[in-house]
């Protein structure tokens, strides 16, 4: 589904293809839940944390005092927007993966607007409601901006955004040429944003594969800006995922509520607890949902009962923390070179501007 904003209005185009896609996503969710709960080591893809409620809760997490990631990255974007724009060029098409509220990206858009540059922004997210809210807000701030919001996952979102980019420049070409990486520069540059340390949710080898897939869609004059959470004192890390207000608890437990809503589960949320800790050996935060007691859960869509012992857990998310050397190695292994790095004074967070090598 695409939302094309014009003036202050939002038009949503839905069709049979969209309905089929939604059914496919529910089937995929059900299948993954079935595999997870039947396994000895229960683990679900963290993307399932981000339904409508999960996305709203995550935006609240970003406002918590313990969650330094959002405000640190935002300060880097605000401070270095002139440098980023100078390196990338003023004639850019900004594509954001997992855009969420787009609050950080608005800082970059504000600088572009102050320089009288045209704004072309393509937020990609799996939450329709978040896209609607964020794009309406951006249009009120930047009434002349060209914003096309794309409801999609990462894998197909970039392709769809690239096609829309071509249309903004009057470029025409066959669909199978959109992804082709070559040395022919367009009249504009694409800047793909992958912020919020979302790269940390990927396993190390999967992170390489993912960035390689992005690299394959870029021309030599395109760029990728990635946010990395850096390795730091363990107490700072664990506090960020165990906020005193308990928002992260609700965010994690919402996954069980989602299974109840969408798949007819009968999880009793009070019988599970949120547990997040720092795995020193793997340099990652792990999030789990731990059963407080011996229990059985029935899921109607699967027509199955699943047993949990006291202490059994569902592994819901990893968040890897990087060193600067690991960032350099990841970029090289993925077919990128580091054009510029931006790090805060505490060296808690890093933004790397990458270009195809």
What residues fall within each predicted segment?
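Substrate-binding/catalytic lobe of Class I Rossmann-like enzymes that use SAM or dcSAM, i.e.
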Residues: 236-320, 328-334
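Conserved SAM-binding loop of SAM-dependent methyltransferases across substrates and taxa
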Residues: 101-116
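Conserved class I S-adenosyl-L-methionine
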Residues: 91-100
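N-terminal auxiliary segments of SAM/dcSAM-dependent transferases
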Residues: 2-47
């Amino acid at each position: 589904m695409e939302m094309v904003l014009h003036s202050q209005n939002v038009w949503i185009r839905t069709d049979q293809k969209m309905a089929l896609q939604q059914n496919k996503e529910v089937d995929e969710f059900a299948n993954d839940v079935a595999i997870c709960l039947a396994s000895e080591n229960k683990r679900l893809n963290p993307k399932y944390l981000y339904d409508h409620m999960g996305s709203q809760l995550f935006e609240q997490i970003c406002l918590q005092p313990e969650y330094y990631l959002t405000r640190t990255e935002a300060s880097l974007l605000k401070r270095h927007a002139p440098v980023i724009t100078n390196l990338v060029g003023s004639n850019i098409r900004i594509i954001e993966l997992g855009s969420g509220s787009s609050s950080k990206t608005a800082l970059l858009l504000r600088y572009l607007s102050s320089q009288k540059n045209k704004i072309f922004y393509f937020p990609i997210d799996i939450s329709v409601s978040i896209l609607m809210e964020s794009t309406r807000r951006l249009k009120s701030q930047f009434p002349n901006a060209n914003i096309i919001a794309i409801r999609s996952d990462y894998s197909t979102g970039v392709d769809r955004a690239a096609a829309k980019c071509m249309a903004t420049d009057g470029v025409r070409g066959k669909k199978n040429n959109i992804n082709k990486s070559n040395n022919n520069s367009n009249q504009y540059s694409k800047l793909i944003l992958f912020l919020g340390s979302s790269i940390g949710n990927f396993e190390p080898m999967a992170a390489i594969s993912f960035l390689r897939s992005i690299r394959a869609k870029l021309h030599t004059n395109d760029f990728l800006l990635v946010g990395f959470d850096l390795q730091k004192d363990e107490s700072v890390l664990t506090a960020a995922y165990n906020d005193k207000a308990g928002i992260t608890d609700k965010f994690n437990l919402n996954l069980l509520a989602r299974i109840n809503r969408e798949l007819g589960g009968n999880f009793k949320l009070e019988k599970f607890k949120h547990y997040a800790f720092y795995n020193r050996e793997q340099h990652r935060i792990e999030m789990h949902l731990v059963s407080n007691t011996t229990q059985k859960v029935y899921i109607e869509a699967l027509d199955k009962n699943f047993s949990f012992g006291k202490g059994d857990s569902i592994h819901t998310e990893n968040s890897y923390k990087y060193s600067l050397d690991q960032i350099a190695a990841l970029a090289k292994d993925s077919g990128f070179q580091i054009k510029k790095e931006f790090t805060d004074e505490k060296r808690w967070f890093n933004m790397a501007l990458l270009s195809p090598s």
